[in-house]
Amino acid sequence: MKREVYLDYAATTPLRKEVYEAMKPFLKEKFGNPSSIHHFGRETRTAIEEAREKIAKAIGAKSDEIIFTSGGTESNNMAIKGVAFALSTKGKHIITSKVEHHAVLEPCHFLEKLGFEITYLPVDREGFVDPDDLKKALRKDTILISIMHANNEIGTIEPIQELSKIAKEYDIYFHTDAVQTVGHIPVNVDELGVDLLSISAHKFYGPKGVGALYIRKGTKIHPLIHGGSQENNKRAGTENVAGIIGMGKAIELAILEMDKEIERLTELRDYFIREVEKRISDVYLNGPRSNRLPNNINFSFAYVEGESILLHLDLEGVEVSTGSACSSSSLEPSHVLSAINVPIELAHGSIRFTLGLYTTKEDLNYTLDVLERIIEKLRTISPYKQEWKINKKS
């Protein structure tokens, strides 16, 4: 019997009922502008500051180090461009990695057009940045290092503590895109040793269109948006009050349930990986088996196109992704899989399954059954099998 199974939690998560209830008053009755000094304004200002405190507490920061944004993309842009513009007289060299989200890579490409030099660090076959490669890439004019906390496609959790120590030795700012980790695994800015950290609410059952950037006190950064004095003069514009309230409630719930969810999702993840590898031949796990996000699974299925698998799964009620949801409409192979040296034929056959709060073992068993049938069907009609074998030999 067909059932609906959502396995694309890395792309976005459903809004929790408790979060919606917390937001509702600020969508209608509590409508005051937080910059107004009358009662309606003070009411929303107080609520925003309470939410800011929740976000700060969740990552071990101070509340005045949290700047609310429109989401992870803006937070990444603000961190990278903001530091670049603030320190351009000191240096114009930035270091990042080849497996970053496009919300980091594209700001770097933009800065290259303005005369900045960007070093894109390689990664190993599991997606890890080598600290020695970072050391070798350092220059006297390096002003920023930006390495993601965990990869959105293959789940690799990077050794941020080790990498940030290198940055500190040379007095270089360190930014991490923690969009996939905040609310899912423990994140503490002091333990990580970072100066800037990006967050997105809709990745942990909060609303879309709201996020935050942690900026360590004393970090020099220029605002991207100019206007009013909101967000400590760092991000102008009337705040998204309901969104911020929802984000605060979502992170509060995520932290309360984190330990239990890590254990549950890790068990489900490992079960799914074992079953896929047992039932289906010529399948390859992309990314590491340990030091991996508890909800992330990425497989390459030989001889078939990932898009065909995705569409057939969709017809069976199973929702998955072929990579980052922000660029999965592209026909180009994933830049992440290319960076870990996955052959192009296998990269085109990749599917990402990401689990979440409402994923059950029954969901996974249903998915396994339909996936097995789909792969078998697609391989019987695939024109790629012989071609792939020829390319593999050459």
UniProtKB/Swiss-Prot annotation:
Top-level taxon of the source organism: Bacteria
Give the E.C. number(s). 2.8.1.7
Q: Which residues bind [2Fe-2S] cluster?
A: 326
Question: Entry's Pfam families?
Answer: Aminotran_5 (PF00266)
Q: Name one GO cellular component term.
A: L-cysteine desulfurase complex
From the Swiss-Prot or TrEMBL record, state where the protein is found: Cytoplasm
Question: N6-(pyridoxal phosphate)lysine modification sites?
Answer: 203
Its GO biological process annotations read:
[2Fe-2S] cluster assembly; amino acid metabolic process
Pathway the protein takes part in? Cofactor biosynthesis; iron-sulfur cluster biosynthesis
Could you name the active-site residues? 326
Catalytic activity entry: (sulfur carrier)-H + L-cysteine = (sulfur carrier)-SH + L-alanine
Q: Which residues bind pyridoxal 5'-phosphate?
A: 72-73, 152, 180, 200-202, 238
Q: Which HAMAP family match?
A: Cys_desulf_IscS
Q: What does this protein do?
A: Master enzyme that delivers sulfur to a number of partners involved in Fe-S cluster assembly, tRNA modification or cofactor biosynthesis. Catalyzes the removal of elemental sulfur atoms from cysteine to produce alanine. Functions as a sulfur delivery protein for Fe-S cluster synthesis onto IscU, an Fe-S scaffold assembly protein, as well as other S acceptor proteins.
Q: Subunit structure, briefly?
A: Homodimer. Forms a heterotetramer with IscU, interacts with other sulfur acceptors.
Name the family. Belongs to the class-V pyridoxal-phosphate-dependent aminotransferase family. NifS/IscS subfamily.
Q: What is this protein called?
A: Cysteine desulfurase IscS
Question: In which organism is this protein found?
Answer: Dictyoglomus turgidum (strain DSM 6724 / Z-1310)
Instruction: Tell me the gene name.
Output: iscS
